[in-house]
Structures are given as C-alpha cells and as structure tokens.
A protein has these predicted regions:
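Protein maturation boundaries and topogenic segments
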Residues: 1-103, 174-176, 180-208
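Short, surface-exposed secondary-structure edge patches
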Residues: 63-67, 82-85, 107, 145, ...
Length: 208
C-alpha cells in the first residue's frame, strides 16, 4: 500500500520534510560559529581588562633587598592610586624620571609637603625618625634635607647603600608612578603578597 510520501512523489509534489531536515542540519553549524566568535571576543575583552588594571614587573638589581630579590616577578596594581592616595611605606613601580623608558621599583618615604632629613644613619620625616625594619643593614648617609613639592614623592630603596633613588635624582612626580606592587608570583620560595609598611612608624607590615 502506498504511503502519503509515495503519493506525493508519484504526483510530482516536493517533499517538504526533506527541506526542514536540511535547515535543521545547517542551524547547529551557525550556532557553533557564533559561540566561537563570542568566546574569542570575550577572551580579548578580559585580556584587555587584565592588562589595563595590572602589569608584570621583573625585579632587576639589588636596590630593594632583602624585601625583593633580583629575578622575582611581581604583579602591579595599576588602578590602586585611582582609588586611594599613595602612602608612606608603599612599594611602587615607577618611570625613572631621567629616562621614562626605564622602570624602577622603590618604597615611598615622603609625601607631598613632607620635610625629609637624612643623617646619622636615620631618615626623619617632619622631625620624626622612621622605624625601618626592612633595611638591608645599617645605611650610611650624607646629611641632606628636602621638602617634597606638591604632586611629588620621595622614594628610597630598601638597600640604601646600593640604590639610585630620590637622594640622587630628586623627587618622583605622581605622573611617573606606574602602580603599586601587589604580589610576588615568581620565584616559588618567595611567593606571596608584597609587604608594605604604613606610615613607617614601627607598625606591623600590611600586605597587598
């Protein structure tokens, strides 16, 4: 006995179910392509956000010993100082003011308006001697003093006897701050949050 499809074929009518089946085959391909494109765009967007908000920095030299060692890799928070003001004790990555293509890493010691005095093996800010437990040995200083201008900072390396810093090239403009050092992600034995000392007044270090 002939089926309905047999009758349609014999009478020359097109068989509609076949077209519907073809459409069903093509639709999954379009969906897959769209999902691939959406995934690529989302990946690029996330990559852009991450690179805008953070940076990577490799410690070169010994100016931040013993806090940071040569060859360690850090994650830098580039947005930190859009949300808060830089503080004494913060470790930052900066553009070297005499050659902005080079980046240094130092610790903020003086804020705008601070009077910095160095002598007799100690740093004083506004007349108060700083407690600096992170220093690499006893520093030797030539007696000097400065007043930090507006929108500028006074930065020093933790390894005072082996550091090119504000004692040599003066104040750091705020516009030359790249970001706040946040995480040591390599080498493995030192992995963790970068220690910051708020106000440098003998308080315990704050990480992050």
């Amino acid at each position: 006995m002939a089926t309905v499809e047999d009758s349609q074929f014999q009478q020359g009518y097109p068989i509609q179910p076949a077209k519907a089946e073809a459409r069903q085959v093509s639709q999954p391909t379009g969906v897959i392509l769209r999902e691939i494109v959406e995934t690529l765009l989302l990946t690029l967007f996330i990559f852009w956000i991450v690179n805008t908000a953070t940076g990577r920095y490799r410690v070169q030299g010994h100016s931040m010993m013993p806090t940071l060692k040569e060859g360690e890799y850090l994650i830098i928070n580039k947005l930190s100082y859009y949300l808060e003001e830089p503080k004494r004790g913060d470790i930052i990555v900066l553009h070297y003011p005499r050659d902005r293509s080079r980046e240094y890493i130092k610790r903020i010691v003086g804020l705008p308006g601070d009077r910095i005095e160095i002598g007799n093996g100690q740093v004083k800010v506004n007349g108060t001697g700083l407690t600096e437990p992170y220093l690499n040995g006893a520093p030797t200083y030539h007696e000097q003093s400065w007043v930090v201008p507006e929108d500028s900072y006074f930065v020093l390396g933790d390894n005072r006897n082996n550091s090119s810093d504000s004692r040599n090239w003066s104040f750091l403009p705020r516009s030359d701050i790249v970001g706040k050092a946040s995480v040591i992600y390599w080498g493995v034995e030192d992995w963790g949050l970068v220690p910051h000392y708020p106000h440098l007044t003998g308080q315990s270090p704050v990480t992050g």
